[in-house]
Amino acid sequence: MSVLLRSVTELCPVYSPFFGSMGITASIVFTVFGGAYGTAKSSVGISSVGVMKPEFIMRSLFPVVFAGVIGLYGLIVCIVLFINVNKSEYSLNRAFLDLGAGLTCGLCGLASGMSIGISGDCGVRGAAQQPKLFVSMLICLIFSEALALYGFIVALIMAATGDNSCVATASTSSSS
């Protein structure tokens, strides 16, 4: 009986929910930082374009919309990871996978938000002066958004895989 309790303690320590919670936090915090940066940086360009050409403001909102979607990716991953966290049946393996998933989604979202902000600001200003640049700006924004989408997909895969067993199996106990 003591071997079974020791195995359960080794596979599911009391501190494993901490790592899962850090993954949840990283997912939402970094994606929101990325979305906020993208929105703020693009808004500066939209404001300056609005002074020169007020009729171009509605077409200039694409970077803000793209940046807002990044926060949704983080929120969805946050909810999926939160469902995984359960103190009584939450293994250290699962906790590290959840931490990795949160960091993957969060940091990809942060990089994407920075890319959207910079390319959105320059793209909006350039498209206001030369309307032919509007399509180029949209393509740059789509590829910048894809960075966050890659992290989102990998985070969902990480959240769906892995072992959450707190009981040692024959393969686990024989390798020790």
From Swiss-Prot:
Cytoplasmic-side segments: 39-62, 120-136
Gene3D superfamilies documented for this protein: lithium bound rotor ring of v- atpase
Marked site: Essential for proton translocation: 145
Membrane topology, Lumenal segments: 1-17, 84-98, 158-176
GO CC terms of this entry: proton-transporting V-type ATPase, V0 domain; vacuolar membrane
Subcellular localization, as worded in the UniProt entry: Vacuole membrane
GO molecular function term, any single one: proton-transporting ATPase activity, rotational mechanism
CDD domains with a match to the protein in the record: ATP-synt_Vo_c_ATP6C_rpt1, ATP-synt_Vo_c_ATP6C_rpt2
InterPro entries: ATPase_proteolipid_c-like_dom (IPR002379), ATPase_proteolipid_csu (IPR000245), ATPase_proteolipid_su_C_euk (IPR011555), F/V-ATP_Csub_sf (IPR035921)
Keywords: Hydrogen ion transport, Ion transport, Membrane, Transmembrane, Transmembrane helix, Transport, Vacuole
Membrane topology note: Multi-pass membrane protein
Signal peptide positions (record): none
Pfam families the record matches: ATP-synt_C
Listed transmembrane segments: 18-38, 63-83, 99-119, 137-157
Family to which this protein belongs: Belongs to the V-ATPase proteolipid subunit family.
Chain's role: Proton-conducting pore forming subunit of the membrane integral V0 complex of vacuolar ATPase. V-ATPase is responsible for acidifying a variety of intracellular compartments in eukaryotic cells.
Assembly information from the UniProt record: V-ATPase is a heteromultimeric enzyme composed of a peripheral catalytic V1 complex (main components: subunits A, B, C, D, E, and F) attached to an integral membrane V0 proton pore complex (main component: the proteolipid protein; which is present as a hexamer that forms the proton-conducting pore).
UniProt name for this protein: V-type proton ATPase 16 kDa proteolipid subunit
Native organism taxonomy: Eukaryota, Amoebozoa, Evosea, Archamoebae, Mastigamoebida
